[in-house]
Structure formats: structure tokens, C-alpha cells
Amino acid sequence: MGKNKQPRGQQRQGGPPAADAAGPDDMEPKKGTGAPKECGEEEPRTCCGCRFPLLLALLQLALGIAVTVVGFLMASISSSLLVRDTPFWAGIIVCLVAYLGLFMLCVSYQVDERTCIQFSMKLLYFLLSALGLTVCVLAVAFAAHHYSQLTQFTCETTLDSCQCKLPSSEPLSRTFVYRDVTDCTSVTGTFKLFLLIQMILNLVCGLVCLLACFVMWKHRYQVFYVGVRICSLTASEGPQQKI
């Protein structure tokens, strides 16, 4: 009767802490770094602060503009150059693909398609990226063929044109004429350098288009199902109330 009783909620000597010390706010799950995220809160993968598919679209746009500019510079050297030898058309197609990708990724992109419009835009971007890959491969092939010919040409200036021939023992060998050229060095030097630049740019651009196709395929057939599985696991591993 004379001994003082310990206050309620105070830890006894040698025993576990009393459960009464925890207030009602402590029973709620705390949100921190270890707290499970909700199903709709999947963080997008980033690269240098930018989402990875968005970075691919930006690369497509930059490379497409570069290919287009170099192609028009090549066309200005001679008026007799074929369209296949000045692949500005490949850059224009890749720029259109990039514009569609930027619109899709910045406005209405979702990893799991929730509407028919999102699915249609992703499918169209996938098909156009495949088309961009095809035209880039063609541009590389045409540029490489013309570059290999320029390395074997013997050129001479005639009036306002440059006439080039392949070394051959036949007297009637084929002659390539580059009109509106005052100096053959613009063909054997400048144009040859532009062909090499086009091969490099179109090769990189084709790889970026291939990677864009892979990312679209992966988001369609892999990330969607993995996201559903993670959501089910996080829902089952939620905090359980102790009895």
C-alpha cells in the first residue's frame, strides 16, 4: 500500500517496453525510403535526368537534322548527283519519327496502354522507327558504294564539269560527269568527306532507331507484366497490424 506505483506506459525493469506508450499516430505506416509504393507510382527510368525513351527521340531528332543538313550540302556541290547519293530523305524521315516520338513521350506516354489511342501511337512509332532503320541502312549502303568508287576515280576538269573514270584497260570505260563543278577537288575531297560523314551519321541513326524499336517492344511485352507482379507483391507485403 505504501509503495508508489509506476506510471502507466513506463518501461519496467528488465521487461519489454509497454505498448501503451505508443500514441495513435505511431500505429499508422510511416512513409519513407523503405515504404512500399503504390501500384501506379512506378518511377520511369531516367538517363541524365531524362526519361530513356524521350532521350532516344531527342537523339533521333538531332541525328535526323544532321543527316538532312549534310545531304543538302552534298546536293549543292553538283547538279548531276543522284538522289540516292545525297540522303537528305533519310534525315527527313527520321525527323518525322522523332517528332511523333516526342509528342507521344511528352504528352500521353504510358508503359501500360490504357486507351486505344496510346496503343495506336506506340505501334505507329514502332513501325516508323523500323522504317527509319531501313532507310538509314540504305543510305549507308549507297554512300559506301559511291565512296568506294571515288577512291578509284581518275578525275580531270573540263569546262564547267568534272569527268571521272575508273582505271580500266578498256578504252570505252564508263565516264562519270559531275556538272557545275569548277574544280575536281570539290568532288574528290569535299564530297568524299561528306560521304564518310553520312555513313557515320546514318549508322548511328540506324542504331538509335533499332534501340527505339527494342524499347517499345520491351515496354509492351515485358515491363507491363513485371509491373503487375510487383504491384501484387507490394500489396501482400504491406504493414500488418499486431494483435
Curated annotation (Swiss-Prot):
Residues 7-24 have a biased composition (Low complexity). Disulfide bonds: none annotated. One of its GO terms (cellular component) is Golgi membrane. Component of the dystrophin-glycoprotein complex (DGC), a complex that spans the muscle plasma membrane and forms a link between the F-actin cytoskeleton and the extracellular matrix. Preferentially associates with the sarcoglycan subcomplex of the DGC. InterPro entries: CD20-like (IPR007237), Sarcospan (IPR030429). Coiled coil: none annotated. Keywords: Cell membrane, Membrane, Postsynaptic cell membrane, Synapse, Transmembrane, Transmembrane helix. It comes from the Eukaryota. It comes from Homo sapiens. PANTHER family: SARCOSPAN. Isoform 1 is expressed exclusively in heart and skeletal muscle. Isoform 2 is expressed in heart, skeletal muscle, thymus, prostate, testis, ovary, small intestine, colon and spleen. Residues 1-53, 108-122, 215-243 are cytoplasmic. This is Sarcospan. Residues 1-43 are annotated as: Disordered. Residues 75-86, 144-193 are extracellular. It is found in: Cell membrane; Cell membrane, Sarcolemma; Postsynaptic cell membrane. Its main location: membrane. It is a multi-pass membrane protein. Pfam families: CD20.
